[in-house]
């Protein structure tokens, strides 16, 4: 182990966390969250303080003109995420009724996420009946790879299980200050957000063909304006933002909501390849608000009694190269069709088909490389059934098929069953789940939602062949 310190975890292989929360009415929230990932030391070795991650927060609401006051760890999100967004989102697979919802301002950070939060103070002040002004400041240590006084990359997973992971812990600092001015009118909502953040060392990733336009430098600032207009059953919403170099990103959406729960959405987005915002996150095919344009159209409606149809098509284009895509100017398509059946409150089932086509690098048998379309097809059947609010059952059957054009396909199957039972006479809930999976390789892996301890969940991926079971109390 001394010769090869990165081949064995420094701690035991169990995961656990501790949460304490207190709230008084809807005005005061306070709490602490502590977490140790599997493999991290606990009160030993490199970690003498017990848990690897601690999060303390205090949130006060509706005290005079102060709508929200946050101390300690908190989250902020404004507009539609082109400037700053620390929310967890389901992206394009969210229901159309929630897709494009405006972000929620200042909130407490009570989760175990070790990256998407800020540390300091944030306040929301009610200037007038329809006007609100927010301000926030953060100073925090962050994980990353620092080499020759440059920050080569930010480490976002929060793992500190090996020596090489501990070497990246708290190696840099980031300060952030920002504000948001919001108007909430009868027929419109308007917002203006400005954020400035600075690292203690310049951010300078090692240059690759795909990261030429990644954020570089010591300081960054962004300004964005968001809007939402209402007229009868129509709403027009969006946001436009610029960075310190004058490069811009914009997202605009038209929503039509007639009677009967129908939603029709048309959305256009343009994220310049050179746009830089460290904390931006919005709707898109990529994971960053950069190097993407697209057109999205979606429909959610009832076609028969108890049967609802959801479908969308997203056409996207990447003007510059991406990771594992060495060709500039690639494009793709993401389409979904889902039929849901819910005759009663206790029973719901749906079947979903998703098709995605995008260009990726492929190495042929003769070692020649080319960028060709990769096609992924997914099918899911899910049944949810509850009995008198005591027992909840969920059955899932998944299938995935992925292949490059003209090449053999990789297939994957997964079947899972979960059950949750609530004891009404005791403050106790029992959750059981089991899954069987069989895939050809890692490319055809399958992911499912899995409940964890209270207020926590995970989304593990499964590949090759095996079974998994879990039990939570």
What spans do the regions from the language model cover?
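Exposed, low-structure sequence patches enriched in small/polar residues
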Residues: 5-15, 172-205, 212-473
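Outer membrane beta-barrel
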Residues: 48-106, 110-143, 258-277, 426-442
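N-terminal periplasmic/intermembrane-space "pro-region" immediately following the signal or transit peptide
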Residues: 1-3, 129
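Long C-terminal interaction/binding lobes of large macromolecular proteins
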Residues: 79, 89-91, 105, 118, ...
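Outer-membrane beta-barrel proteins
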Residues: 35-53, 107-114, 167-170, 241-243, ...
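Hydrophobic, small-residue-rich alpha-helical packing segments that form membrane-like cores
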Residues: 119, 127, 137-204
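Surface-exposed loop/turn segments flanking beta-strands in extracellular/periplasmic regions
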Residues: 90-101, 147-163, 451-456
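Outer-membrane beta-barrel translocator/receptor signature
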Residues: 3-18, 22-30, 34-40, 46-54, ...
């Amino acid at each position: 182990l001394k010769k090869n310190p990165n081949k064995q975890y420094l701690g035991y292989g169990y995961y656990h966390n501790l949460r304490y929360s207190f709230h008084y009415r809807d005005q005061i929230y306070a709490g602490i969250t502590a977490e140790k990932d599997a493999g991290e030391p606990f009160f030993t070795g490199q970690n003498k303080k017990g848990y690897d991650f601690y999060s303390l927060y205090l949130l006060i609401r509706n005290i005079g003109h102060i709508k929200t006051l946050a101390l300690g760890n908190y989250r902020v999100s404004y507009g539609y995420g082109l400037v700053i967004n620390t929310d967890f989102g389901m992206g394009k697979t969210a229901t159309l009724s929630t897709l494009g919802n405006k972000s929620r301002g200042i909130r407490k950070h009570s989760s175990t996420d070790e990256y998407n939060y800020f540390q300091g103070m944030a306040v929301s002040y009610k200037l007038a009946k329809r006007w609100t002004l927010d301000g926030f400041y953060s100073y925090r240590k962050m994980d990353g790879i620092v080499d020759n006084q440059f920050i080569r990359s930010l480490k976002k997973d929060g793992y500190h299980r090996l020596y090489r992971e501990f070497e990246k812990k708290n190696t840099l600092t980031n300060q952030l200050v920002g504000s948001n001015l919001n108007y909430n009118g009868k027929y419109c909502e308007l917002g203006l957000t400005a954020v400035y953040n600075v690292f203690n060392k310049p951010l300078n990733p090692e240059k690759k063909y795909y990261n030429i336009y990644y954020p570089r430098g010591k300081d960054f600032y962004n300004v964005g304006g968001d809007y939402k207009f209402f007229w009868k059953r129509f709403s027009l919403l969006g946001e436009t933002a610029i960075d310190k170099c004058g490069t811009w990103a914009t997202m605009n959406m038209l929503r039509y909501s007639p009677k009967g729960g129908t939603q029709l959405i048309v959305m256009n987005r343009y994220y310049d390849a050179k746009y830089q915002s460290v904390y931006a996150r919005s709707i898109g095919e990529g994971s960053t608000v950069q190097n993407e344009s697209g057109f999205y159209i979606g429909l959610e409606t009832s076609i028969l009694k108890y049967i609802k149809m959801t479908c969308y098509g997203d056409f996207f284009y990447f003007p510059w190269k991406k990771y594992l895509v060495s060709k500039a100017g690639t494009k793709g398509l993401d389409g979904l069709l889902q039929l849901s059946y819910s005759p009663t409150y206790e029973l719901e089932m749906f079947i979903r088909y998703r098709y995605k086509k995008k260009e990726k690098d492929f190495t042929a048998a003769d070692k020649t490389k080319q960028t060709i379309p990769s096609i992924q097809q997914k099918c899911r059947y899910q049944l949810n059934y509850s009995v008198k609010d005591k027992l909840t059952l969920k059955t899932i059957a998944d299938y995935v098929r992925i292949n490059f054009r003209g090449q053999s396909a990789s297939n994957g199957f997964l079947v899972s069953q979960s059950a949750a039972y609530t004891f009404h006479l005791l403050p106790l809930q029992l959750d059981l789940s089991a899954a069987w999976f069989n895939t050809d390789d890692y490319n055809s892996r399958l992911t499912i939602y899995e409940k964890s301890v209270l207020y926590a969940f995970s989304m593990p991926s499964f590949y090759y062949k095996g079974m998994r079971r879990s039990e939570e109390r």
